């Protein structure tokens, strides 16, 4: 059976569909399900750990592709281990590579139907604007680190349900394959639930490197104060980079973070060679259909 396509200019548009299966939850948590379903594999967790302000949790493993920036280009790693390198502006390459990719859905309740998840580093802005780039690369992590997700689990806090979603060919054969995989995913999610597990977290962090001394940091604070007085800025987030040595596992650190600083926007990405852990009180931008939402702090036309 041929993959369904539609003509789009001179390109052939690849059409896929999101198939799903929903089951009820009793008292299973997102962390318990993640540990059972994803475990130590390459994967992600986007969690709302504030049920009053967030509804959904998404998690997945074994991405179809991993996309990373490399100098002036992209490296695309397939699930089978093969790689493809593209040269040019990474933002333009991303748009071009996935412009012919469309996911359709039958269930309008699906808040997420698959696609790219991951992180964009601060230097991502340099792909869109001409800015000085004199800072050394201290950590060696790609500015763009994304996963193409075509199978994942979604937890709905309000409905107290879990949905397995698989993106497959928009054909009868694709539907059968996807629904079989959905059944497997539900079993995997509950197979190794550990409800009485105790936290193994033991604070052992040792700071071995700081980006600023107290004097250097204080000098930057005073400089920002002057910028505000002069009217150049009205707010600045001043950060520091600390390198901390620890024996803790990445996901254990994430679990500790969600207890210390729970929020509607928590995230954990395991790219195997590195992990990203974070918690935010608010979103920056969201597009749903033809509507675009921004928080007041970041409201700007610059994204255009």
Model feature map: region roles:
Residues 1-11:
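N-terminal amphipathic/basic-hydrophobic helices that include classical n-h-c signal peptides
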Residues 12-300:
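Extended alpha-helical targeting/anchoring segments
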């Amino acid at each position: 059976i041929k993959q369904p396509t539609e003509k789009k200019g001179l390109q052939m548009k690849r059409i896929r569909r999101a198939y799903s299966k929903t089951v009820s939850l009793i008292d299973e948590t997102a962390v318990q399900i993640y540990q059972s379903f994803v475990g130590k594999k390459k994967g992600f967790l986007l969690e709302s750990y504030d049920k009053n302000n967030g509804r959904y949790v998404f998690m997945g493993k074994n991405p179809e592709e991993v996309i990373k920036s490399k100098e002036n280009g992209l490296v695309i790693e397939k699930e089978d281990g093969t790689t493809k390198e593209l040269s040019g502006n990474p933002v333009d390459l991303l748009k071009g590579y996935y412009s012919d990719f469309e996911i359709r859905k039958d269930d309008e309740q699906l808040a997420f139907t698959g696609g790219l998840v991951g992180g964009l580093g601060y230097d991502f802005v340099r792909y869109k604007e001409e800015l000085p780039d004199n800072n050394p690369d201290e950590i060696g992590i790609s500015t763009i680190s994304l996963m193409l997700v075509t199978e994942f689990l979604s937890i709905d806090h309000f409905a107290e349900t879990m949905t397995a979603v698989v993106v497959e060919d928009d054909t009868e054969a694709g539907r059968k394959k996807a629904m079989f995989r959905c059944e497997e995913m539900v079993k995997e999610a509950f197979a190794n639930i550990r409800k009485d597990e105790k936290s193994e977290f033991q604070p052992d962090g040792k700071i071995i490197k700081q980006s600023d001394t107290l004097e250097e940091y204080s000098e930057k604070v005073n400089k920002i104060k002057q910028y505000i007085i002069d009217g150049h800025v009205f707010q600045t987030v001043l950060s520091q980079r600390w390198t901390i040595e620890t024996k803790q596992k990445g996901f254990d650190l994430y679990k500790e973070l969600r207890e210390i600083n729970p929020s509607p926007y928590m995230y954990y990405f395991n790219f195997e060679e590195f992990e990203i852990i974070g918690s935010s009180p608010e979103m920056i931008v969201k597009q749903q259909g033809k509507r675009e939402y921004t928080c007041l702090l970041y409201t700007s036309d610059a994204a255009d």
